[in-house]
Design a protein with these regions (language model features):
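Acidic, proline/glycine-enriched N-terminal capping motif
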Residues: 1-148
Length: 148
């Protein structure tokens, strides 16, 4: 069974809607750069490994740099589109997905021992009191169907 585990450093980005100019859809530079970061990280780790040909299960976990609201489906869309043709032939093969977002704690330790205060810009990122750096965790596995 083919299985890929990937960690992409940096703040996860949502896939932006393409802008239409003269009847043509144009993907913005920020989205292209973010997709390229996912693609490049996959190629760096797995080289020219053959993409999965069968059904795919994917698990995505987005460790966010802020509590700014982002739709989970647009976060997932960027990652799954970036892996088309490298991890799997096409994202239509994805038949099972689990997506989660990890947001930084609203409250952080205060200056006095045992106290808490509201998180401010520039505070370390904490989840349940544990520090982290923004990144995306991706787990992809082929679903083996014994009847095929």
């Amino acid at each position: 069974m083919n299985c890929f585990d990937l960690t992409v450093p940096g703040d996860p980005l949502s896939k932006a809607r393409p802008r239409v100019y003269n009847g043509h859809g144009i993907t913005d530079r920020r989205t292209r750069n973010a997709e390229n970061r996912v693609y490049s990280e996959f190629r760096r780790k797995y080289g020219d490994m053959e993409p999965i040909k069968g059904d795919v299960r994917i698990r995505l976990k987005f460790w966010m740099a802020s509590r700014h609201p982002r739709d989970w489906d647009n976060l997932a869309k960027l990652a799954t589109d970036a892996l088309n043709g490298v991890a799997y032939q096409d994202d239509v093969q994805i038949v099972e997905a689990q997506v989660s977002k990890v947001l930084p704690d609203r409250r952080v330790p205060g200056s006095k021992p045992g106290t808490m205060r509201n998180r401010k810009t520039g505070d370390p990122l904490l989840f349940m009191g544990e520090p982290y750096e923004p990144h995306t965790e991706i787990h992809i596995s082929e679903i083996i169907n014994p009847t095929n």
